Structure formats: structure tokens, C-alpha cells
Regions:
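TPR-adjacent "capping" and linker segments in tetratricopeptide-repeat scaffold/adaptor proteins
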Residues: 9-23
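Register position in tetratricopeptide repeats
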Residues: 33-34, 67-68, 100-102, 136, ...
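Short coil turns that delineate tetratricopeptide repeat
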Residues: 18, 52, 86, 121, ...
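Start-of-helix register in tetratricopeptide repeats
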Residues: 22, 56, 89-90, 125, ...
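Residue-level recognition of tetratricopeptide repeat
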Residues: 29, 63, 97-98, 132, ...
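Canonical tetratricopeptide repeat
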Residues: 26, 60, 94-95, 129, ...
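Single-residue signature of alpha-solenoid repeat helices
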Residues: 40, 74, 109, 143, ...
């Protein structure tokens, strides 16, 4: 960030010192470009002695201080670089402020970044850091506003949708988080990751089967061997009594693949019960209990008790 910028504030030096400074300034840059960082260090320090008001040299000094774990010196140099040339040297200074775990410094960083953003409307890196700063301080609504700015630069895409989803989830606004996922799926319906996110959000927010079924169907189209989704689809079909034969077919596949899974056995047993096959229902529900171990799911016990009562 600004490692190879032009020298600043040399007009206050004598002609002789200007020439001397420029020679060593560009030599330091050459060495840094060649990744001879340690070799460049004494030259940078000499440049600082010649001209302590050069933004680039202060930035270098700050970065060297960071490698030496001298936090106070690093903060001073990087702050000075920012003061001398805010548009060029905002990045390292604000990274340090945001990492400080000092809320006053973090708020200061936000204020400065906001002011910079007012005069640099197309700086993606600047807006990205401002958004991170808002997230650090849990100002998620402000972070969402910044996302609008980022979208005006990059356009709306998967990364934007993901960030909007996360920020709304942080705000515990599950309804809007779902809308963000659904919005992107209208553009890219074959995006498996987003289909999974939608399904998980639906499950977390206990959406009705009418919403869950299409979500499971979409994933199965892309991942037809996903038996967990297969089981959940079968269960939701069973809940609303829709296409019980298909529910039975899907559920049968799950218990064939995992014959000791109590959840899958329970689903199959309950579908058998809904189909009126009492003997099979009790057989599979009992197996679900047997394979549950010490902790038996209450729902499995409820299903077994209800089936036992009605299938006498």
C-alpha cells in the first residue's frame, strides 16, 4: 500500500539535501522491489533522518517497526504517514487502529474512513475496510449500507449476496436473510452452496413443509445421493400427507443405505403408519428405539406410542 509512491515534502530541504534524499529514497525503493528488505532498512532510516516529513518513508519506518514488534513506534510512524498523505497511506494506519482492541481507536478509524469515503466514492478497498470496521464494532446496519456502495462499484454478485445474508443473520433478521438467499437464487438457481444455505435457514426458522419441500427437491436434483436431504424430504411429504408413495420410496433408500440410523428408521416407520401398514410401522419404529442408544429422541417415542395405541 503506497510502497512505491513518490517522495513528499522535500521542498523544505536544501538543494544538496534534496538530491541526497532522492538518491537514497529511490535506492531504498529499488531494494524493496527486489525484496532485499533488510538491506533497504538502514537506507530508509537515513532517509528519515534527512526528511522525517516524507509520507512514504514514515510508512516504511512503520512497517519495519511492526516487524520488530514495536507497536508504539509503528503506530506513530503509520499515523504520521497518514497525516502527511491520507489518500495514499490510510490502509496500514487504519488496520493498526482496528486491531488495537481499543474502542476509541476503532471509532476514530471509522470516522476517518467515513471522511475518506466521501471524497473517494469508487475505492473498493476503502469501502471493504470500512465495512470490516463496522462489523468489528457490531454496527451491522451500517455495514449493510456500505454493501450498497460496494455493489455500485462491482455489481451485485454471489459475494454480495453472501455478505448481505451474513449481516442480516448477525442482526437476527432471518426473514431478510432468507430473502437475500432467495434473491440470488433467482439469478443463479443452480448454485449448490446457496441452495444449501436456503435449506439451512428454512430449517433454523422452522418453515412450513410447503417451503421446505421445494428447497429439498432443488438440492436433490443437484445431489441425488444426499440421504439426509432425502430423509428430510420424505418426512415433509409425510407431514402434509402429500405423495406418500414417493415419501416411502425415498425413505426406503435411506434405511437401505443406513439400516441402523434411528432417525431414518423413525421416518420410514411413521410413513408406514400414515399408509396404514401397522405391522411394518411398529417394526421400524421399534428398531428406531433399539438403535437410539441411551438417549432416545422424544419424537421417536411419541411416534411409537401413538402407533402402538392405534394399531392394536
Amino acid at each position: 500500500h503506497g510502497l512505491y509512491a513518490n517522495p513528499t515534502a522535500i521542498d523544505t530541504l536544501s538543494i544538496e539535501k534534496q538530491q541526497q534524499f532522492l538518491y537514497y529514497f529511490y535506492e531504498a525503493q529499488r531494494l524493496i522491489q527486489c525484496e532485499e528488505i533488510e538491506k533497504a532498512k538502514p537506507i530508509v532510516e537515513f532517509c528519515y533522518e534527512l526528511n522525517p516529513n516524507d509520507a512514504t518513508i514514515n510508512n516504511y519506518m512503520g512497517l519495519y517497526a511492526q516487524t520488530e514488534q514495536d507497536a508504539d513506534a509503528a503506530a506513530g510512524y503509520l499515523r504520521r504517514a497518514y497525516e502527511l498523505a491520507p489518500k495514499e497511506y490510510w490502509y496500514n494506519h487504519h488496520v493498526l487502529l482496528l486491531k488495537s482492541n481499543d474502542k476509541k481507536k476503532q471509532q476514530q478509524a471509522i470516522k476517518q474512513l467515513e471522511n475518506l469515503a466521501k471524497t473517494d466514492l469508487k475505492n473498493e478497498e476503502l469501502y471493504t475496510m470500512l465495512q470490516k470496521a463496522y462489523i468489528v464494532l457490531k454496527q451491522y446496519r451500517q455495514a449493510l449500507i456500505v454493501q450498497d456502495n460496494l455493489d455500485s462499484i462491482n455489481g451485485y454478485n454471489a459475494m454480495s449476496a453472501m455478505q448481505r445474508y451474513r449481516l442480516n443473520a448477525m442482526l437476527k433478521n432471518n426473514k431478510q436473510a432468507i430473502k437475500e438467499i432467495e434473491r440470488y437464487l433467482e439469478i443463479d438457481p443452480d448454485n449448490y452452496q446457496f441452495q444449501v444455505f436456503r435449506m439451512q435457514l428454512y430449517e433454523q426458522t422452522h418453515q412450513p413443509p410447503e417451503k421446505m419441500i421445494p428447497a429439498y427437491e432443488a438440492i436433490l436434483r443437484m445431489d441425488p445421493r444426499n440421504i439426509l436431504v432425502m430423509n428430510n424430504l420424505a418426512w415433509n411429504l409425510c407431514l402434509i400427507g402429500k405423495d406418500l408413495m414417493r415419501a416411502e420410496e425415498l425413505s426406503r433408500i435411506t434405511i437401505m443405505r443406513e439400516p441402523t440410523n434411528p432417525i431414518y428408521l423413525d421416518t420410514y416407520g411413521w410413513i408406514m403408519y400414515r399408509l396404514g401398514h401397522c405391522e411394518s410401522a411398529l417394526f421400524y419404529l421399534k428398531r428406531a428405539i433399539e438403535h437410539s442408544g441411551e438417549k432416545i429422541d422424544k419424537e421417536i417415542l411419541t411416534h411409537y406410542k401413538e402407533a402402538s395405541k392405534r394399531c392394536k
